[in-house]
Amino acid sequence: MKPVVVILGRPNVGKSTLFNRLTRTQNALVDDMPGVTRDRLYGDVEWNGVFFSLVDTGGFLSGDDDFFMPHIQSQIHRAIDEADAVLLVFDGKSGISPFDREAMAFLQSASCPVFYLVNKIDSPEREVYTAEFFGLGLDNLYPVSGAHGYGVTDFLDDLVNALPETEPEPPADDMIKLAVVGRPNVGKSTLINRILGQERMIVSDVPGTTRESVDTVCEIDGRSYLLIDTAGLRRKSRVSVKLEKFSAIKTLKSLDRCDIALILVDAEEGVTDQDVTIAGYAFERGCGCIFLVNKWDLAKEQEKKAKTFYDDLQDQAKFLSFAPAVTISAATGFRVKKIFELIDAVHAQYTFNIKTGELNNIFERATRSKEPPFHKGRRLKFNYAVQVATGPPTFICFVNFPSGVHFSYKRYLINAIRRETGLDKTPIRLFFREKPGRIDFAALKPSEKRGGKKTRRK
């Protein structure tokens, strides 16, 4: 699980510019497949071989006064408690404001490292504007420029050294790890409580791997499932959409750890942009996904609405066209047992492994049926393919011009794999390399490393 770093600062200090600067250090975030909603609330960053998730709080505070409201501070406290480091950004041009002083005092109780960034300092000559900030006696103070990159490398060197080492997820005895995610008040807590209250279930709480989190093991029909970080979900609370954005940190951490994301959407309200954004989080992290259309007992004209709802999901979340959907009612228990039948089916595909010979036969038939296109006057030649991971199934194909493979032909090859293997309910990762040879797992991008288990060539 990657460390999480949170950016704080008053409006217009350049948080978003700095955010974009840092996240561009790893430009190809995941797949180039069209249709993935990219909410710039978070991004993945790599520096000197260290990966971490960066969360931008820019959309949380509309003005300085928001910060001082008790319920806002409570939510910021929660975000900081979940973070492994905090960046407080100042405006080097306008100097210290009352907001900055209050924010510094607020962060004195933070248990994680705090880095103070004086932004808009783009040259050594402009560092004179940082004098009043250095006069505050702050440790970890850095003059930087999000727009031009000045000072960013020095700051990043110290930041990654302060982050906790990423520890591998402990073995879960072959339990399927589940994360229940969704927008506010969609029924996450109700579903968790319904699952844990079902008959014939054996329930126990076990320590999670994140601070103050609790994972819950439940056994259904002899199979064990791990519900990730149920502590927050089982405490029912109604908060505004604005405040709920802080929970994105917890959502990201849960998605980093899970095999399958159970994405709840509201049958009454329909598919919203926020639903698609959360689905995008899960897709980018390579999770198996199941849409749970909740509150179906309250929906009017159910049969007619079901087809419309599924069509909307397919239209707005094209990148998750493989994800099954089922209508449920967490409140009444309607079809809740059906969820676990789908989980088992998705997980079987999520951990699918294919022999190298069979995989290459699929590629041979696909490229023979639809000839590869040209790239700069030369036809693409697909030499060899190998599965390098499961969870999700991840493949690398060696081709003479990797950058010349258009997303449409890549999609065609993925569909060929789906068609011939029956993998219609799992994400599939396909990457291209120029030269065949030994797979260097250390050099893979984060999106390529999402697979839970490496596979040997057969």
From Swiss-Prot:
Binding of GTP 1, residues: 9-16, 56-60, 119-122
Described function: GTPase that plays an essential role in the late steps of ribosome biogenesis.
One GO molecular-function entry: GTP binding
Keywords from the UniProt entry: GTP-binding, Nucleotide-binding, Repeat, Ribosome biogenesis
Boundaries of every EngA-type G domain copy: 3-167, 176-351
Protein's name according to its UniProt entry: GTPase Der
Segments forming domain KH-like: 352-436
Quaternary assembly: Associates with the 50S ribosomal subunit.
CDD domains documented for this protein: EngA1, EngA2
Pfam name, any one: MMR_HSR1
GO biological process: ribosome biogenesis
UniProt: GTP 2 binding residues: 182-189, 229-233, 294-297
Similarity field: Belongs to the TRAFAC class TrmE-Era-EngA-EngB-Septin-like GTPase superfamily. EngA (Der) GTPase family.
